[in-house]
Curated annotation (Swiss-Prot):
Domain called Ig-like C2-type: residue spans: 366-454
Localization per Swiss-Prot or TrEMBL: Membrane; Presynaptic cell membrane
Keyword terms, alphabetized: Cell membrane, Cell projection, Disulfide bond, Glycoprotein, Immunoglobulin domain, Leucine-rich repeat, Membrane, Phosphoprotein, Repeat, Signal, Synapse, Transmembrane, Transmembrane helix
Taxon lineage: Eukaryota, Metazoa, Chordata, Craniata, Vertebrata
Covalent S-S links between cysteines: 387-438
GO biological process, one term: synaptic membrane adhesion
Domain notes: The extreme C-terminus binds to the first 2 PDZ domains of DLG4.
Role played: Synaptic adhesion protein. Regulates the formation of excitatory synapses. The trans-synaptic adhesion between LRRC4B and PTPRF regulates the formation of excitatory synapses in a bidirectional manner.
Top-level division of the source organism's lineage: Eukaryota
This protein's name: Leucine-rich repeat-containing protein 4B
Low complexity: compositionally biased ranges: 528-544
Domain LRRCT, chain residue ranges per copy: 313-365
Length: 709
């Protein structure tokens, strides 16, 4: 046996007879220390896991320990700091009623097994970031009755198993957004008695999807904060506040709530449908408030409600509480005296509400102040059918064309009953067409009023047009009292007469966006209800010119169409600008080319063969007879040159001389101005008289030819 234990020993074996004294001592120590061998004490091993802190073998001097140091109590020791020698295997630590002011970072880092930490009734005013590091097993954290002014959101990091957080009775002034989103595992949150609380953010409770209990009692609340994120909340404490009015939607999203406490909350009025969201409510406490009556059938949607506390309220027993008496008789038939007593009138004072019946009162059916009216709309639009009474103590339900009874809180995708009794359509369809009946009920009976909803299909060609599209048209948007959300756009087209200058068109007139009555189009029903006419508005005036054309466009499409038209205009403008630039560039190129061609042509003409005219003495070329003839002809030409056309009588010359006659005449005219009306004598005075015969020699410099004159 000894040999077996030696094999399990961490000490190496030595040959028999050579075992030294220290090794024998270690062997004896190991054999006679079962706790160490089995790891039962585990102090040395656990201290290593605790971050290297010295092993805690005993309870701190200022505390008392039990259950092998797993439960440590240090209450009423006037401690200013958290003791540093708390055993590492502590699961429960109570530090209440001391003078601790600051919880420093990593104070509890070595207490990895701690489950409950109580720091209540101290002077804690500051909790440093990371103060609760190293507490992965912490389940409950109590910080009530301290001096915290803010919620220590950052300190809750890494508390992945925290289930309960107590912050009651601290001078906290505000609860910011996402104050507890670092501890989504919370099940119970106590924020009661925050008497200096002034502000709760709309997103203060975001992330608390597992919360089951919330205490907001005695926090001086004037309104119920946003609790929509608490989808699993089962118990809600709102007692001790100043909630004068409970509105519809105050408990939106709390479909799992089972218990609601509103004692001593100064509640004076609970509006119709205020509790409709509490489908799972089982217990409701409204005692010690200022309630005088409740809306008709307030508790009807609460199918699971079993216990209602209504005592200590100044109930005014009249027709408005008669329904409550009937409800109490049905809910608690064995004890109708459990809940409330009449405070007025004097004849019924002290009577239990559950004992009242209709014989005590003279009641009348409700009056509908604003009945619904017929409505004509186009498919896809929103619509409302109003049904209002003079008091909120009644209940309002709607009967649809297919026989469905619509109440407040009834789930429909597009249709709902608002808290004021209005039947709201978010997006009407053709199938919604039919007669809708409003039923207003109180203890004496009910009153009904009906209206017809006409839904016309959208015209695929002229989408948004009101049926006929003009006054008097019988389109789907007609009908007195029906509101269609259309806007009228008047477009003027001007025709220019021949000879008249076209004038600039006037600006387009628009009717301001908003509901316009269909009755103005003249297509409404003649038997429409009178109240509708009082709430109608006339359409914008339009010009009577025959060139004006009116188009009706839904305002829901104005923005989208305007943007689309703007894009088209921009594209067209860019195309026009591009074409203009291209044409300008081409014109410039053509102009430059034309200029260059013209310049080249002028240069070519300037450098062409030079023509010369040479006047020579005829005597050197012709015989005497010919010279005389030429002289005579010249004399005749000199006499007739002033009056008429000049003619040069040329003698009979040789054939080669006559071939150049026309050319000489043309050159002569070009040189002297080519005036057909005047003779050559007027242009050239040198030819008025010919003293000697002359010859013109014309031609190029290379070949000068002769012409006899």
């Amino acid at each position: 046996m000894a040999q077996a234990h030696i094999r399990g020993s961490p000490c190496p074996l030595l040959p028999p007879g050579r075992m030294s004294w220290p090794h024998g001592a270690l062997l004896l120590l190991w054999l006679f220390s079962p706790p160490l061998r089995a790891g039962g004490g585990g102090v040395a091993v656990t201290s290593a896991a605790g971050g290297g802190s010295p092993p805690a073998t005993s309870c701190p001097a200022a505390c008392s320990c039990s259950n092998q140091a797993s439960r440590v109590i240090c209450t009423r020791r006037e401690l200013a700091e958290v003791p540093a020698s708390i055993p590492v295997n502590t699961r429960y630590l109570n530090l209440q009623e001391n003078s601790i002011q600051v919880i420093r970072t990593d104070t509890f880092k070595h207490l990895r097994h701690l489950e409950i930490l109580q720091l209540s009734k101290n002077l804690v005013r500051k909790i440093e970031v990371g103060a609760f590091n190293g507490l992965p097993s912490l389940n409950t954290l109590e910080l009530f009755d301290n001096r915290l002014t803010t919620v220590p959101t950052q300190a809750f990091e890494y508390l992945s198993k925290l289930r309960e957080l107590w912050l009651r009775n601290n001078p906290i002034e505000s609860i910011p957004s996402y104050a507890f989103n670092r501890v989504p595992s919370l099940r119970r949150l106590d924020l009661g008695e925050l008497k200096r609380l002034e502000y709760i953010s709309e997103a203060a409770f975001e992330g608390l999807v597992n919360l089951r209990y919330l205490n907001l009692g005695m926090c001086n609340l004037k309104d119920i904060p946003n609790l929509t994120a608490l989808v699993r909340l089962e118990e809600l404490e709102l007692s001790g506040n100043r909630l004068d009015l409970i509105r519809p939607g105050s408990f939106q999203g709390l479909t799992s709530l089972r218990k609601l406490w509103l004692m001593h909350a100064q509640v004076a009025t609970i509006e119709r449908n205020a509790f409709d969201d509490l489908k799972s409510l089982e217990e409701l406490n409204l005692s010690h408030n200022n309630l005088m009556s409740l809306p008709h059938d307030l508790f009807t949607p609460l199918h699971r409600l079993e216990r209602v506390h209504l005592n200590h309220n100044p109930w005014h027993c009249n027709c408005d509480v008669l329904w409550l008496s009937w409800w109490l008789k049905e809910t608690v038939p064995s004890n109708t005296t459990c809940c409330a007593r009449c405070h007025a009138p004097a004849g019924l004072k002290g009577r239990y509400i559950g004992e009242l019946d209709q014989s005590h009162f003279t009641c009348y059916a409700p009056v509908i102040v604003e009945p619904p009216t017929d409505l004509n709309v186009t498919e896809g639009m929103a619509a409302e059918l109003k049904c209002r009474t003079g008091t909120s103590m009644t209940s309002v339900n709607w009967l649809t064309p297919n026989g469905t009874l619509m109440t407040h809180g009834s789930y429909r995708v597009r249709i709902s009953v608002l808290h004021d009794g209005t039947l709201n359509f978010t997006n009407v369809t053709v199938q919604d067409t039919g007669q809708y009946t409003c039923m207003v009920t109180n203890s004496a009976g009910n009153t009904t009023a009906s209206a017809t909803l006409n839904v016309s299909a959208v015209d695929p060609v002229a989408a948004g047009g009101p049926g006929g599209g003009g006054p008097g048209g019988g389109g789907g948007a007609g009908g007195a009292g029906g509101y269609t959300y259309f806007t009228t756009v008047t477009v003027e087209t001007l025709e220019t007469q021949p000879g008249e200058e076209a004038q600039q068109p006037r600006g387009t007139e628009k009717e301001p966006p908003g509901p316009t009555t269909d009755g103005a189009w003249g297509g409404g029903r003649p038997d429409a209800a009178a109240p509708a006419s009082a709430s109608t508005t006339a359409p914008a005036p339009r010009s009577s010119r025959p060139t004006e054309k009116a188009f009706t466009v839904p305002i829901t499409d104005v923005t989208e169409n305007a943007l689309k038209d703007l894009d088209d205009v921009m594209k067209t403008t860019k195309i026009i600008i591009g074409c203009f630039v291209a044409i300008t560039f081409m014109a410039a190129v053509m102009l430059v080319a034309f200029y260059k061609l013209r310049k080249q042509h002028q240069l070519h003409k300037h450098h062409g063969p030079t023509r010369t005219v040479e006047i020579i003495n005829v005597e050197d070329e012709l015989p005497a007879a010919s010279a005389v003839s030429v002289a005579a002809a010249a004399a005749v030409a000199g006499g007739a040159g002033v009056g008429g056309d000049s003619h040069l009588a040329l003698p009979a010359l040789e054939r080669d001389h006559l071939n150049h006659h026309h050319y000489v005449a043309a050159a002569f005219k070009a040189h002297y101005g080519g005036n057909p009306g005047g003779g050559c004598g007027a242009k050239g005075p040198g030819l008025n008289s010919i003293h000697e015969p002359l010859l013109f020699k014309s031609g190029s410099k290379e070949n000068v030819q002769e012409t006899q004159i």
